[in-house]
From Swiss-Prot:
GO BP annotation list: translation
UniProt family annotation: Belongs to the universal ribosomal protein uL5 family.
Lineage of origin: Bacteria, Bacillati, Bacillota, Clostridia, Thermoanaerobacterales
Pfam families hit by this protein: Ribosomal_L5, Ribosomal_L5_C
PANTHER family according to UniProt: 60S RIBOSOMAL PROTEIN L11-RELATED (PTHR11994)
NCBIfam families: PRK00010.1
UniProt protein name: Large ribosomal subunit protein uL5
GO cellular component, as recorded: ribonucleoprotein complex; ribosome
GO MF annotations, alphabetized: rRNA binding; structural constituent of ribosome; tRNA binding
Gene responsible for this protein: rplE
Length: 179
């Protein structure tokens, strides 16, 4: 069992039950999944860029990502329906906890001038979205092997009903929020 999951079961659940006054252990919010998405805009001119993004994401997440395709054609962006425009991966269970542990304790502190993540990035339903400007903050990425600096979106989906509950959950799990 991963370190973060153990922490969730032993420390976070009792703390949240006390803080929000839940009567049943099943009411306590938990992290459902983590979705990581890399938009590869240059994939239409350079198909190799997509492969590089797939490799990066595979190393970061520990599982093979799925290629996302354009839903409709947009002339201004010069894309047609069905063209590959990004890669995403959905983590659940142990892999999700391992990734979050790595994100909170290793990757985020390596961001330049890091003061904490914004406490305003909740969506109103208890999910948290986070943008990262470069993939280099992850320890698996070798600086010499990357072709281009890519950003990514990380969405943490929780079962919390409100943003306040979700923030309490993520704070107790070790998410470094800005004060």
């Amino acid at each position: 069992m991963s370190r973060l999951r153990e922490k969730y079961e032993k420390e976070v659940v009792p703390a949240l039950m006390e803080r929000f006054g839940y009567k049943n252990i099943m009411q306590v919010p938990k992290v459902e999944k983590v979705v990581i998405n890399i938009g590869v805009g240059e994939a239409k001119e350079n198909p190799k860029a997509l492969e590089a993004a797939v490799d990066d994401l595979t190393m970061i997440a520990g599982q093979k990502p799925v290629i996302t395709r354009a839903k409709r054609s947009i002339a201004n962006f010069k894309i047609r329906k069905g063209m590959p425009i990004g890669v995403k991966v959905t983590l659940r269970g142990e892999r999700m906890y391992e990734f979050m542990d790595k994100l909170f304790n290793i990757a985020l502190p390596r961001v330049r001038d890091f003061k904490g993540v914004s406490p305003n990035s909740f969506d109103g339903r208890g999910n948290y979205a986070l943008g990262i400007k470069e993939q280099l903050i992850f320890p698996e990425i070798d600086y010499d092997k990357i072709d281009k600096i890519r950003g990514m979106d990380i969405i943490i989906v929780t079962t919390a009903k409100t943003d306040e509950e979700a923030k309490g959950l993520l704070e107790l799990l070790g998410m470094p929020f800005a004060k």
